[in-house]
C-alpha cells in the first residue's frame, strides 16, 4: 500500500502561492483598477474588495510558432475555393468587450478575465508606498528595540529550540498512521497462530505460513522510522517591535457656513481615507479631531464626521486649540506630531495673517509634518497665499494642495503622504 503525505505548509490555502504570483504579474492592471475604484466609490465603502478585469489579450502566454514564408509540404482536404499558391485569409475576430451593439454572424473573440481581490489585498494596493514622512525616533539614538515573544510551534527552526514533547507526539501519531493496518494484521496473524498451535499442532504448513507472514509484518513495521524530519517541532520565537516613538495626528476640518455640503463631503472623505491609512499602518498613534467655524472644539470621530454644527469662519481658532492640546498632552520631546487641515480657503480677512503667525511660531517648530488641502474650484484667497509663505520657510515639513472634486482625493493624498527617506 502506498501513502501520500501532504507536507505543504499552507494546506488550507493550496493556491496561495499561485495567487500571489498572479497578483505580482498583473500588478499594473490591479493598481489601475484600485485607483479607479477609489475615485468611484465612497471612502466609507472600503469594507470589501474589488472586481478586477484584465483584457484577454494581456493574459495570453507567449508561444513559439512558424513564421510566414518558407516552403512546407502539407496535405489538406480538397476544396473548391483555393488553388496552389493562394494565401488563406485570416478569420475575422477581435477581443471581447462590453456595451450595446448588434449581434454578428461571424468572427470570434475573447472576453475579459475577471476575478475578485479581498479587502486586505485592496487596501494593500491602495496604500502601497505610503508612509507618514520623517517619522523619527525619540528618546533613543540607536535602532528600534525589540522583545522576543513566543509565537507557537514551527516545523523549522534552530535545533536548540526543539520542542521534545511536540516532536515525540507528532512521531507517535505518524507511526500509528503508517503502521496501523500492519499492526492490526499482525495481531490477527498472531491470534490465528496461537489457535492453530493449540488446536492443530500437527498442521505444520499453516503454522509455517503464519510465521512467515508474522515476520514480514514485523519487518514492515520496523521499516517505519521512529523519527522523521517531518516530526520535528520547534518553539517559534519572533521579535516584536517595542515602539520607541509615539505619534499623534491632528485632523482639522472647516465646517463653517461658507463650506457647501459637497465641499464638506470631500473634506470628510479625505479625513476618512487618512484615518484608514493611520489605523492600518500605525498601531500606536493618537488621532485628535478638531472641527472649527468661528470657534473650535475637540470632538470624537463620530461627531467629527457627522455633526451638523456650522457657523462663520475663523481658522485661527482651530490652530490655537491645536497648540493648547500639544502643550498639554503631546510635548514634542516625547511625541512625533503630524497635522492635516482641510478648508475651502474662505476666512475672515484679518485672521489669515494670525494663522500664519501661529503656525510659524507656535506649531511648525514642533511638528514633523503639516499638510493643508484647500477644497475649491475657485481662485485662491488670502489664506492660501499666507500658507505659501509658510511653505517657503518650512519646505521639508509643510505641504499644501488643492482639491476640486472627489476624484482628486486619492492622487492628492498619495502626493502628500508618499514615502520619503529620513535624512
Curated annotation (Swiss-Prot):
It holds the Pfam family DUF444. It comes from the Bacteria. Residues 93-107 have a biased composition (Gly residues). It comes from Pseudomonas syringae pv. tomato (strain ATCC BAA-871 / DC3000). SUPFAM superfamilies: vWA-like. Residues 65-110 are annotated as: Disordered. HAMAP family: UPF0229. Transmembrane segments: none annotated. InterPro entries: UPF0229, vWFA_dom_sf. Belongs to the UPF0229 family. This is UPF0229 protein PSPTO_0546.
Amino acid at each position: 500500500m502506498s501513502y501520500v503525505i501532504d507536507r505543504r505548509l499552507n494546506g488550507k490555502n493550496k493556491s496561495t502561492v499561485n495567487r500571489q504570483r498572479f497578483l505580482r504579474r498583473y500588478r499594473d492592471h490591479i493598481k489601475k483598477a484600485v485607483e479607479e475604484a477609489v475615485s468611484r466609490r465612497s471612502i466609507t465603502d472600503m469594507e470589501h474588495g474589488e472586481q478586477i478585469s484584465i483584457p484577454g489579450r494581456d493574459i495570453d502566454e507567449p508561444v513559439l510558432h512558424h513564421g510566414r514564408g518558407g516552403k512546407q509540404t502539407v496535405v489538406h482536404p480538397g476544396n473548391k475555393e483555393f488553388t496552389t499558391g493562394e494565401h488563406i485569409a485570416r478569420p475575422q475576430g477581435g477581443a471581447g468587450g462590453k456595451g450595446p451593439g448588434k449581434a454578428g454572424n461571424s468572427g470570434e473573440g475573447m472576453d475579459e478575465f475577471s476575478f475578485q481581490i479581498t479587502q486586505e489585498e485592496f487596501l494593500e494596493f491602495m496604500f502601497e508606498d505610503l508612509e507618514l514622512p520623517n517619522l523619527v525616533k525619540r528618546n533613543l539614538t540607536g535602532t528600534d528595540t525589540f522583545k522576543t515573544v513566543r509565537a507557537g510551534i514551527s516545523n523549522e527552526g534552530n535545533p536548540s529550540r526543539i520542542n521534545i514533547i511536540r516532536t515525540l507526539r507528532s512521531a507517535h501519531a505518524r507511526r500509528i498512521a503508517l503502521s496501523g493496518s500492519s499492526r492490526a494484521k499482525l495481531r490477527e496473524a498472531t491470534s490465528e497462530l496461537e489457535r492453530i498451535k493449540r488446536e492443530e499442532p500437527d498442521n505444520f504448513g499453516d503454522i509455517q505460513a503464519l510465521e512467515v507472514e508474522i515476520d514480514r509484518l514485523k519487518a514492515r513495521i520496523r521499516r517505519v522510522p521512529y523519527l522523521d524530519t517531518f516530526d520535528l517541532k520547534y518553539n517559534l520565537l519572533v521579535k516584536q517591535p517595542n515602539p520607541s516613538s509615539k505619534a499623534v495626528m491632528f485632523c482639522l476640518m472647516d465646517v463653517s457656513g461658507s463650506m457647501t455640503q459637497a465641499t464638506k463631503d470631500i473634506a470628510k472623505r479625505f479625513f476618512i481615507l487618512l484615518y484608514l491609512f493611520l489605523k492600518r499602518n500605525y498601531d500606536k498613534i493618537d488621532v485628535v479631531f478638531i472641527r472649527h467655524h468661528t470657534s473650535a472644539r475637540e470632538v470624537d470621530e463620530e461627531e467629527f464626521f457627522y455633526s451638523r454644527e456650522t457657523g462663520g469662519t475663523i481658522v485661527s481658532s482651530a490652530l490655537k486649540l491645536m497648540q493648547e492640546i500639544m502643550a498639554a498632552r503631546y510635548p514634542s520631546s516625547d511625541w512625533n506630531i503630524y497635522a492635516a487641515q482641510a478648508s475651502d480657503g474662505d476666512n475672515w480677512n484679518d485672521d489669515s495673517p494670525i494663522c500664519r503667525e501661529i503656525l510659524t511660531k507656535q506649531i511648525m517648530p514642533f511638528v514633523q509634518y503639516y499638510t493643508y488641502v484647500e477644497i475649491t474650484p475657485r481662485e485662491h484667497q488670502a489664506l492660501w497665499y499666507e500658507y505659501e509663505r509658510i511653505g517657503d520657510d518650512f519646505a521639508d515639513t509643510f505641504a499644501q494642495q488643492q482639491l476640486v472634486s472627489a476624484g482628486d482625493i486619492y492622487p492628492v493624498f498619495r502626493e502628500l503622504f508618499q514615502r520619503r527617506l529620513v535624512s
